[in-house]
């Protein structure tokens, strides 16, 4: 499990660096994305870079950090069917997919995002960040999102990510 954890952090740091982050930022953000700690080296969080590539890397790392590490181990051992059919996998990824679409709709309706692609990207990012308890942001503020969306975000925090992940240590 430690090899998976460290491997994700190293791969994330390299990907961030390749995407334009300084080595300092790349290492630190990766070390906060995988363990879903969410600390950022800039006050604007991930929005500082204004980069869809960096956002995509962060989504992948947060999703990996929120995935049951025993399931990641199975996946790395080539047991794709065991990974996909485990009860947590479709629920976790299904929740992300459905809620990303819902939040994207809210973002479009409230003018947070300029178009559908941006709304889907930002919606997916915020859903994954909240569901995994990471706390990274790509939008300026939650203050103007309205009570319905804030309530939905609160529910996502309660649902959380998978057991035996960096987000949830329940056994």
List where the protein language model places each region.
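Membrane-proximal intracellular helices of multi-pass ion channels
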Residues: 1-171
């Amino acid at each position: 499990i430690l090899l998976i954890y460290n491997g994700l952090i190293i791969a994330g740091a390299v990907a961030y660096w390749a995407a334009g982050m300084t080595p300092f930022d790349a290492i630190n953000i990766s070390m906060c994305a995988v363990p879903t700690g969410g600390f950022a080296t800039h006050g604007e969080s991930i929005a500082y870079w204004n980069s869809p590539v960096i956002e995509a890397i962060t989504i992948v790392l947060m999703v990996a950090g929120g995935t049951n590490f025993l399931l990641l181990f199975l996946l790395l051992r080539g047991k794709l069917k065991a990974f996909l059919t485990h009860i947590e996998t479709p629920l976790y990824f299904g929740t992300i997919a459905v809620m990303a679409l819902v939040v994207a709709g809210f973002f479009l309706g409230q003018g947070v995002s300029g178009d559908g692609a941006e709304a889907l990207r930002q919606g997916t990012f915020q859903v994954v960040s909240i569901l995994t308890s990471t706390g990274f942001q790509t939008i300026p503020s939650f203050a103007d999102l309205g009570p319905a969306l804030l309530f939905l975000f609160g529910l996502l925090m309660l649902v959380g990510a998978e057991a035996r992940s960096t987000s949830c240590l329940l056994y």
